[in-house]
Every structure is written in structure tokens, then in C-alpha cells.
Amino acid sequence: MRPVKLSAAATVDLTKEYFEKNDILLIPTIVVIDDKEYWDDYENITPRFLYDTMKEGKLPTTSSNPIMSYYEHWKKYVDEGYDIVHMDLSSGLSGTYNNAVMAAKMIEDEVGEKRVYVPDTLAASCGEALILDAANDLKNEGKSASEIHYWIVENRLRANHWFTLSDFSHLFRGGRVSRTKMILGSALNIYPIMRMDVEGKLVQKKNTRGSKKAFKTLVDIMEQRADGGKDYNKKVFITHSDYLEGAEEVEKLIKKKFKNAESIEIHDLHQIGVHTGPGTVSIFFWGEERID
């Protein structure tokens, strides 16, 4: 059995230190500002830079990673004898997954056998991080690339993603809400509760009014869906887009209710924050499978 090299796009919203500590290959992702491409590797651009840019009235966008970017990052490890398992943003949110699949096929055609596995995570942000972290545990247990790939496909829908946000304008810009909903949402202090569906797409579940109600709703949903309910003993990730105080408030609620959680980590949103805009808070945990 060949050794396994894990690979993940920067959309997982972890840290450079995490990748270095666990010897995981980080694939930078592209953010476009004023027609200039920036490669986000957690150093070239920062969340602070992104959100300050938005406050200046500029509208950053994202772009799918080129096929050759994946190929060039992976080929040297394949040549060194590794099999690779790569985790990327859901195919339901971006075309970058398809580019990764094509790069893997290029390598397969070149070397004559499958060496790069690209499961569709159907995840985003720290939902990807949950899966990556589990894959790293499996690698350390000595599992093969094909076994890790199989586990991800079988368990990916258990990675729960729940979001809320305070600003509808970026959802309107992305075509996810109508102009009427944007205006009413802002006027009525609506905080939508959103989640990932079975196709790995971001969908709205319900509306709440005010941040306190929204944060409580997120934690109540976690109690209903998390493995073990209040006895949940696995990792929890919280992300935010320029809304640290909101993330810390959710962290307090989770600590109060889930006293056995293995760890609770807060991270900045990178690429997903480009689409949701400032004011987003999200939670990620292992729990019941998404069914719709």
C-alpha cells in the first residue's frame, strides 16, 4: 500500500499552521478584486483585507482553480510514490470540484492508474474542515487512499452546516434572494437560518428576528441534530465574516449546552465570506444526515 498525502483547498477555512502541523497539502484559491487575481493561501490576502475592501464598496468575487494548478501541486507527490486524497468546495457551490476531478484524470491517464482521489465533499468552509480532520485521523490509522475516499462519501452528509447572517445585500448580489426580500430583511432585522442541502447547496430554512434569537436557534438546531444531542463529544467549528463578537456569543452558548464537546474552534470565513458578506456566523458539527 502506498503512503497517503492529503490535499485540501483553502476553502476549508483552517490555518496555515494546521496544514503544516499535519503535513497536508494546501491548494490556494482565487479571489478577484478589481479584475486582479489574488491567490489565497492564508498569507497573500487576509479576511481583514477582504472585508475592508467590501466596506470600501468594492465587490470581490471568486474564480475556479485552473486544472493545471491542481495538476502541478499533485504530480510531484505522485512521482514520489504517494496516493492523494483531495478535499474541495462542494460541486453544488463551485465548478472548482470538476476542475480537480479533471486534473486527477490527467494524472491517471499519464501514469496508467488511479492515484488521486477527489470525493465531492458536498461541504463548504469548516464543513470541509470536519471532513479533512476525520480524513487525517484515518490516514494516521493507516487507511489507504481508497478507504479514506470511501469513508468520506459514506459520511459527508453527516457534516452539518448551519449559517445565519445580518446583511442580505450580498445574497441579493449572488442571486440567492430577491430585491424585495433584501429590503424587507434589512428593515425588519431578519436573520435567515441557512444550511447545506443534500446536493451541497446553500438553502434557507427559516427566518428569525435579531441576532440573539438567531444564535439561540443555531444552538437549538445543534442540540436536535448533533451526535448524542447534549452529550455531543466531537469537534465543533464556528466561522464568521468580520463578526467575531457574534461567533464568540455562539461559542458561549455551545459551551454552556455541550459540556463534553471535544473542542470548539473559531475561524475566519475566506471565500464563502466573499459571497455572504460581513455579518455571517456559522456552526459545523457531526450529526444526523441531511435528507433534503
What are these regions (language model features)?
Residues 5-64, 69:
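N-terminal glycine-rich anion-binding loop in soluble enzyme alpha/beta folds
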